[in-house]
């Protein structure tokens, strides 16, 4: 949204719009930036909880659910039926494919494959992350046994 120049940051001129289709719910204190080079679009049936940030030129598909405090950077494509739980952060210029679910407080920095569930920061497939977390719980016991 800003160009870094030697004399400081220069705000880019916006020529886009915000397009909100039918049956979209936008909760309290949401921020939706208009597009810089194209439109920011929220498609039919999508629901935004309170305090959601949608940056410029982002396209959100049909029947998506974004829980409270989700932040989406610019130029992101979120395909249909995606669920982003609370406080998920999404890096710019990526695609979240159809049917993806991202658990709360996850950080998304790359494209996510269709129909999978993700968790963590950086996020990975949720089952793998849960395995890692369960192994971390027993790690102190393993280290103690190795020291004996």
For each feature predicted by the language model, list its residue ranges.
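Structural signal for interior beta-strand "rungs" in well-ordered beta-sheet cores
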Residues: 1-125
């Amino acid at each position: 949204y800003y160009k870094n120049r030697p004399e400081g940051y220069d705000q880019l001129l916006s020529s886009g719009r915000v397009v909100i289709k039918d049956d979209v719910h936008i909760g309290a204190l949401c921020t939706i930036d208009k597009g810089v080079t194209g439109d920011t679009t929220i498609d039919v049936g999508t629901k935004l909880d309170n305090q959601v940030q949608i940056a410029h030129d982002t396209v959100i598909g049909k029947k998506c659910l974004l829980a409270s405090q989700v932040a989406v950077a610019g130029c992101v494509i979120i395909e249909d039926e995606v669920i982003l739980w609370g406080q998920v952060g999404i890096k710019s210029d990526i695609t979240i494919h159809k049917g993806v679910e991202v658990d709360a407080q996850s950080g998304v920095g790359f494209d996510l494959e269709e129909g999978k569930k993700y968790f963590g920061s950086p996020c990975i497939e949720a089952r793998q992350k849960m395995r890692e977390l369960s192994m971390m719980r027993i790690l102190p016991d393993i280290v103690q046994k190795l020291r004996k």
